[in-house]
C-alpha cells in the first residue's frame, strides 16, 4: 500500500486542476482498495451542500447533480462528526440517503472518511462495495492517510 500511496501523491502533485486531482484520487483509490465505488464529495460554501464531484463506479452523469445538505445522508454524518464511518449495511443506517440517479443501489458496504484541511472539512471520500462487510482496519487506515495527505492538494487546487 505504501507504493500505491507514493504513486497517488506523485500523480496528484503533478495534476494541474482540481478535477484532475479528484479523478486521480477516485481512480487510484478504487483500484488499490478493490472497491466497487470510490467517490469524492466536496463542500460548496455558496449553498452549504456536499456535491458529488468525482466518482468511479457510480453513474458519471450524477457528478455535480447529487447535492446533500451539510447534515444529510452518510456523507453529511461523516462531515459533521469529522471521523470515518465504516458500515457493512449502509442502507440500514438511519442517516442513509438514496439517490437513484447515482445507480448506487447494489452497494451495501460503506466507508466514508472526512477530508480535513486546517480543521475545516473540505469534503468526504466514500468507498462502497456490493458485499456486506466492514472495511478492514488496514483499508480504513489507507483511506484516512490518503485524505490527510491529499487535503492540502485539494485545498490548493480549489484555490487556484
Regions found by a protein language model. Give the residues of each.
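Short regulatory alpha-helical segment in sensory/regulatory domains of signaling proteins that mediates
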Residues: 9-14, 25-34, 42-44, 60, ...
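A short, aliphatic-rich beta-strand micro-motif
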Residues: 108-116, 124
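Short beta-strand-to-loop transition segments that serve as allosteric relay/switch motifs
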Residues: 58, 124-133
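Signal-transmission linkers at sensory-effector interfaces
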Residues: 1-20, 31, 122, 153-160
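GAF sensory/regulatory domain recognition
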Residues: 27, 38-66, 91-93
Amino acid at each position: 500500500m505504501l507504493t500505491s500511496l507514493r504513486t497517488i501523491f506523485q500523480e496528484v502533485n503533478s495534476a494541474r486542476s482540481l478535477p484532475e486531482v479528484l479523478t486521480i484520487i477516485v481512480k487510484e483509490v478504487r483500484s488499490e482498495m478493490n472497491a466497487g465505488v470510490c467517490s469524492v464529495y466536496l463542500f460548496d460554501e455558496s449553498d452549504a451542500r456536499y456535491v458529488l464531484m468525482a466518482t468511479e463506479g457510480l453513474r458519471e452523469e450524477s457528478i455535480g447533480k447529487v447535492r446533500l445538505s451539510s447534515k444529510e445522508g452518510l456523507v453529511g454524518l461523516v462531515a459533521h462528526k469529522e471521523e470515518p464511518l465504516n458500515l457493512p449495511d449502509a442502507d440500514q443506517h438511519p442517516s442513509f440517503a438514496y439517490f437513484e440517479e447515482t445507480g448506487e443501489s447494489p452497494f451495501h458496504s460503506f466507508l466514508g472518511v472526512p477530508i480535513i484541511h486546517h480543521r475545516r472539512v473540505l469534503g468526504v471520500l466514500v468507498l462502497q462495495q456490493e458485499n456486506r462487510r466492514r472495511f478492514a482496519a488496514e483499508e480504513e487506515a489507507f483511506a484516512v492517510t490518503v485524505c490527510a495527505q491529499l487535503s492540502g492538494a485539494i485545498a490548493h487546487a480549489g484555490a487556484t
